[in-house]
């Protein structure tokens, strides 16, 4: 947003090796920007095609810009390109960056497992990105069979009582003497006090599920005289700032090509995406209706539960229900 409003143009014709590095040479921004000011700047600069690269918030911004362009009857194409590690863009099965983030997340999980196994009743706790969608946590769990509990925003859980996380963790320690827990950052928010404050983009500020788990695990185990050692790993931005995997590089290249083809063919107000191995054009209004979330009745989530062996913890929806 800021680079368009200023405007600040960047010559990229000589940047032939940018695909080898993480990050972005274009920069990024957070917070609402005025669609009117952006379109004013596009007009002044004689820009006829705008590519908006990003996640759910960026696609909503693209929709606002597209509507402002249409209201002025301007000939400016607005094309969205999905890029978010959270994989939470509606109708986009997999966004660019997701595979890379999952790959890096597995390294953190492997470290947590190593630490947990290195001491009696060792517990490795890993917090991964995923404010409202638990795709990274679920996919990384499936990739690493060492995970014993996975917690995601879409599946509430209880701490104590029958089927609670803490009794299940106690049983795990009694039988195997170590455990690994993976939690998406948005998991367990129903157990935390939240102020209701928001960030610059209007997202609710989350409580820290890792702090909750660390304190509650210590309280529960100490009360029962169970010696334990908990090691906490938060890879945070590491999983999104690394160079892309080979598959993500290829995927990104195709997304860029199809986005340019769409714009040159006169398309606008759309997002380019890949569905069932076909690159398609999706209306911006469609992909911004809601945020894509992990379906807890899906094969993916059921496989994650089977991989961990945790089953449905108390508070999660019953497994026997069907998704209508």
Language model regions located:
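Short, ordered loop/turn segments at secondary-structure junctions
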Residues: 1, 30-31, 55-56, 81-87, ...
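Glycine-rich oxoanion-binding loops at beta->alpha junctions
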Residues: 1-50, 57-59, 85, 96-103, ...
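Flexible loop/turn segments at secondary-structure boundaries
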Residues: 1-2, 34, 59-60, 88, ...
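Accessory alpha-helical/coil subdomains and C-terminal extensions
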Residues: 41, 52-54, 60-75, 79, ...
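Short, high-confidence coil segments that cap the C-terminus of an alpha-helix
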Residues: 47, 177-178, 268
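Short beta-strand elements at the ligand-binding edges of bilobed clamshell
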Residues: 90-102, 243-246
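C-terminal non-catalytic interaction/assembly regions of soluble proteins
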Residues: 197-324
């Amino acid at each position: 947003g800021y680079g368009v409003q200023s405007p600040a143009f960047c010559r990229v014709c000589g940047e032939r090796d940018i695909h080898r590095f993480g990050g972005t040479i274009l920069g990024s921004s957070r917070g609402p920007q005025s669609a009117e000011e952006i379109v004013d700047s596009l007009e002044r600069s004689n820009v006829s095609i705008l590519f908006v690269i990003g996640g759910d918030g960026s696609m909503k911004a693209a929709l606002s810009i597209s509507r402002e362009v249409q209201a002025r009857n301007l000939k400016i194409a607005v094309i969205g390109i999905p890029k978010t590690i959270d994989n939470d863009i509606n109708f986009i099965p997999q966004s660019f960056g997701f595979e890379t983030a999952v790959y890096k997340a597995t390294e953190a999980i492997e470290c947590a497992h190593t630490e947990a196994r290195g001491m009696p009743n060792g517990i490795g706790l890993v917090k991964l990105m995923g404010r409202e969608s638990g795709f990274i946590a679920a996919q990384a769990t499936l990739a690493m069979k060492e995970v014993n509990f996975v917690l995601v925003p879409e599946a509430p859980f209880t701490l104590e009582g029958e089927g609670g996380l803490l009794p299940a963790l106690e049983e795990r320690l009694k039988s195997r003497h170590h455990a690994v827990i993976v939690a998406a950052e948005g998991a367990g928010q129903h157990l935390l006090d939240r102020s209701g404050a928001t960030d610059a983009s209007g997202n609710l500020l989350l409580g820290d599920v890792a702090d909750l788990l660390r304190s509650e695990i210590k309280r529960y185990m100490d009360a029962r005289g169970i010696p334990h050692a908990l090691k906490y790993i938060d890879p945070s931005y590491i999983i999104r700032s690394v160079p892309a995997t080979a598959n993500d590089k290829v995927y990104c290249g195709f997304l860029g090509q199809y986005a340019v083809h769409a714009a040159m063919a006169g398309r606008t107000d759309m997002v380019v995406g890949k569905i069932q191995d076909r690159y398609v054009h999706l209306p911006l209004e469609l992909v911004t209706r809601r945020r894509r979330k992990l379906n807890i009745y899906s094969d993916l989530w059921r496989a994650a539960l089977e991989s961990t062996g945790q089953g449905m913890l108390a508070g999660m929806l019953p497994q026997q229900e069907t998704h209508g």
